[in-house]
Regions:
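Class I SAM-dependent methyltransferase SAM/SAH-binding core
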Residues: 123, 131-177
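A short glycine-rich, Lys/Arg-flanked "PGG" loop and its adjoining helix->strand segment in the class I
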Residues: 201-212
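Conserved Class I S-adenosyl-L-methionine
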Residues: 267-363
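Conserved catalytic/acceptor-binding region of the Class I
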Residues: 212-300
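A short SAM/SAH-binding and catalytic strip from SAM-dependent methyltransferases
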Residues: 186-200
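Conserved beta-strand/loop positions that form the S-adenosyl-L-methionine
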Residues: 127
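A short acidic, Gly/Pro-enriched loop at the edge of an enzyme's catalytic core
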Residues: 177-187
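Conserved class I S-adenosyl-L-methionine
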Residues: 59-119
Length: 363
């Protein structure tokens, strides 16, 4: 791949359902293609105010805290391999993904920029940009950003969202297949996407593409046990629904913010940290020769959803989007009814954003 000259304007096709993000985190759909299956506007807000311990390694405090959405889109036959299936389903729900997926706390982005020294002369590679959830916060710093996204619809949405920044380029390809010279970047970053890359390739290739002072940064929004989404009025009925309709999704049990922070801060190289954070069962590859010890930071925060936005957020996750339509729609309709009847149509959900940053090892 030849990297295009800096300053070339990247634009997606006009009128392809771009999403306008307003102050406070609300979203407004700009095209009917992005609201297919949604019978009411999706609105949500993210409370990124700093809880005690926000951005640090201390425990976070305990807190008390219309019609069903059916964005189901059938998948093509023959997708048996999990990575391929997930990539395909995200691409087929690109509009829903764009409007429903949360971004990242401003403090996390500020720390990322500060620790990695991101500025106008920086060269950044983002792996799995989605529709630009993190990119839109990095782009104003002026760094040259090459975004890799395997899904063509996701990439088109990212181009539409990021077209105002001439320093951003979106490339439709797998990271494994990206062909660029070694030592091309100062920062390789991936937000809630690195686990979809082949682990035999991910860390080694990221290290090879970094220059001598370069850094790898990984972020994710971990689901935690805080907010009314685990309120006793709805939690057990939702668990019963999952046991009956979606046993493959899980049992509606979430770790506490303290548990997530403890796993993140338990030491080891960046691959070990990330395997614990994402609760992966397989052993990560040893990275002694690739990266130094990571800096790890955590950011607990709270999101507030109306019922449609909450159901859309669930549907944007691969485990729900891969369900067959009948079970998917029954599950979401039942959860929506519980939210309406028990929580007056509004639900809060706690996340813990985890960020791990490691410098490329010398040599």
């Amino acid at each position: 791949m030849q990297l295009r000259p800096f300053g070339h304007q990247v634009r997606g096709p006009a009128g392809q359902g771009a999403v306008q993000h307003r102050a406070g985190g609300d979203v407004d759909l700009g095209g009917s293609a992005y609201s297919a299956g949604l019978e009411a506007p999706i609105k949500h807000s993210h409370d990124f105010r700093c809880w005690p311990g926000y951005g640090e390694s201390v425990p976070a405090p305990r807190r008390e805290d219309s019609s069903p959405v059916s964005p189901y889109i059938p998948l093509p036959a023959g997708l048996a391999e999990p990575r391929s299936s997930a990539a395909a389903v995200f691409d087929r729900i690109a509009g829903l993904y764009d409007q429903a997926r949360p971004g990242y706390p401003p403090e996390a982005v500020t720390d990322l920029v500060r620790i990695c020294g991101v500025g106008s002369s920086s060269r950044v590679l983002e792996i799995g940009c989605g529709t630009g959830q993190l990119t839109r916060d990095l782009a104003p710093n002026g760094a040259r950003i090459v975004c890799v996204e395997v899904g063509s619809s996701l990439a088109d949405a990212a181009r539409a969202n990021l077209g105002r920044w001439p320093n951003v380029e979106v490339v439709t390809t797998r990271f494994e297949d990206l062909d660029v010279p070694t030592s091309s970047f100062d920062l390789v970053v991936s937000a809630t996407a690195f686990h979809w890359v082949d682990p035999e390739v991910s860390y080694a290739k990221a290290a090879a593409l970094l220059d001598e002072q370069g850094k790898l940064a990984l972020l994710t929004n971990a689901h935690s046990r805080g907010g009314t989404h685990i309120d006793e009025r709805i939690a057990e009925p939702i668990r019963d629904l999952h046991r009956r309709l979606a046993p493959e999704v899980g049992d509606w049990d979430f770790p506490t913010a303290e548990d997530i922070q403890h796993r993140a801060q338990a030491g080891g190289d960046i691959a070990s940290v990330w395997a614990r954070v994402e609760r992966r069962l397989s052993d990560p590859p040893p990275l002694e020769q690739l990266f130094g010890q990571p800096t790890v930071k955590t950011y607990p925060w709270l999101a507030t959803y109306d019922r449609n936005a909450y159901l859309a957020m669930l549907s944007s996750q691969s485990s729900y989007a891969l369900m067959d339509q009948v079970r998917h729609d029954e599950l979401l309709a039942s959860i929506g009814t519980l939210i309406d009847e028990k929580l007056a149509g509004t639900v809060t959900k706690e996340y813990v954003t985890v960020m791990a940053i490691a410098a490329r090892a010398p040599g």
